[in-house]
A protein has these predicted regions:
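A short, well-structured alpha-helix characteristic of acyl/acetyltransferase catalytic modules
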Residues: 10-32, 152-154, 164-173, 275-282
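Hydrophobic adenine-recognition pocket in adenosine-nucleotide-binding enzymes
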Residues: 8, 85-87
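Active-site rim helix/loop that mediates acceptor-substrate recognition in acyltransferases
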Residues: 17-58, 62-63, 67-70, 175-195
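Short, structured interface segments
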Residues: 128-152
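Intrinsically disordered, low-complexity, positively biased terminal segments
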Residues: 1-2, 54-58, 62-64, 88-89, ...
C-alpha cells in the first residue's frame, strides 16, 4: 500500500485521537507503565485542540484513504516541538514514523526554526533509537512526578495568577534561563487562567503555564519552582516533568510524598543552551 502525507483537518480528530490513545496504550502496556493518554476520548480532545490551534502544524499519514498515523508540531515559538508523533500499532514496521519525522525536520528547516525538540518515554527504545539516527541528541533525563496536591506555602514567595501585564517579565525570565522565550504558550495559559507567577522581593522570579504534563515552568531558583509546585491544586495529565539531574528538587519532591511515575528523555536538534536557572519542561520540551 502506498502512503501519503497531508496536512491535518478537523475531521481527522476522531481517527487521529484514537490512534494516539492506542499507540500510547500499546507501548505502555508492553512495559507495564501507566498510560499518559488514559482514554480515546482524551486523545480525541487533545487532537481536536491541536487541529483547531493556529500555532500547531499537523501531518497525517494515510494509506488507501485510512489514517494510520500523525505528527503535530507546536510552532508557537522560536523552537518547534513534536507533540506528539503516533502510528497505529497495527501498522508498525512500515517506516511510517520515520517518514513523518523526516517531513517534520524538513518543515523545520524550511521555516527556519532555531531547533526542533521532543520528549519521549525512556522505556520506548524504538523511539529513542529512531530519533538518535535522525540527529536528535538526548539532553536531559526527566522524571514524571505525581501525587496529591502539597498545599505548601513559602514565606516571601507569593504565588498568584499570571496576568497579561506579567507576560514581558515572564518571557524575559525564560530568555535568561533558556536563551529563548515561550511566549505563545504562556499567552495561551494566561488566557485560559492556568498560568501562575511567583513574586519575591517585588519581582516576578518564576512562572508556570501550569504544573502539569502539558505545561512548563521557569524560575530563577529551585525555591520558585517549589513555591509553584507547592501551590498547585492538581497535577494535570497524570503528573508533571522534573529534570532528574536537579537533585535538590527531585529529592525535595520525593520527600513531600510525590512519586515517580516513569522516566522520559528531552531530545533536541539545532539550538540548545544548557539552562541557566531552574525549570520544569512540558511533554513537548
Amino acid at each position: 500500500m502506498d502512503m501519503i502525507l497531508r496536512p491535518g483537518r478537523l475531521e481527522d480528530a476522531d481517527a487521529c485521537g484514537r490512534i494516539v490513545f492506542e499507540a500510547f496504550k500499546s507501548i505502555a502496556s508492553q512495559h507495564n507503565f501507566p498510560l499518559d493518554i488514559p482514554s480515546a476520548e482524551i486523545g480525541i480532545r487533545l487532537v481536536t485542540r491541536m487541529l483547531s490551534h493556529p500555532g500547531f502544524y499537523s501531518l497525517i499519514a494515510e494509506m488507501d484513504g485510512t489514517v494510520v498515523g500523525s505528527l503535530f508540531l507546536d510552532e508557537s515559538g522560536p523552537i518547534a516541538a513534536v507533540d506528539p508523533l503516533t502510528v497505529d500499532p497495527a501498522m508498525q514496521n512500515q517506516s511510517i514514523g520515520r517518514r513523518l519525522m523526516l517531513a517534520a525536520l524538513e518543515r523545520v528547516a524550511e521555516r527556519r526554526f532555531a531547533g526542533l525538540r521532543l520528549v519521549q518515554s525512556a522505556y520506548h527504545y524504538r523511539s529513542l533509537c529512531l530519533c538518535a539516527k535522525l540527529g536528535f541528541v538526548a539532553r536531559e533525563p526527566l522524571s514524571k512526578m505525581d501525587g496529591a496536591p502539597l498545599e505548601i506555602k513559602f514565606p516571601g514567595y507569593d504565588v498568584r495568577p499570571a496576568l497579561v501585564g506579567d507576560l514581558a517579565a515572564c518571557s524575559a525570565l525564560c530568555r535568561r534561563v533558556h536563551g529563548h522565550d515561550r511566549g505563545g504558550e504562556l499567552q495561551d495559559a494566561v488566557s485560559q487562567g492556568t498560568a501562575r507567577v511567583v513574586e519575591h522581593l517585588g519581582a516576578v522570579t518564576a512562572y508556570a503555564t501550569d504544573i502539569a504534563f502539558f505545561a512548563h515552568a521557569v524560575a530563577q531558583s529551585n525555591q520558585g519552582l517549589k513555591a509553584l509546585i507547592g501551590a498547585a491544586s492538581s497535577f494535570g495529565g497524570g503528573g508533571f516533568l522534573l529534570p532528574t539531574r536537579n537533585g535538590e528538587l527531585f529529592s525535595w519532591a520525593l520527600q513531600q510524598g510525590l512519586r515517580l511515575v516513569h522516566q522520559m528523555n528531552l531530545m533536541t536538534t539545532g539550538l540548545y543552551n544548557e539552562p541557566a536557572g531552574a525549570y520544569l519542561p512540558s511533554v513537548a520540551y
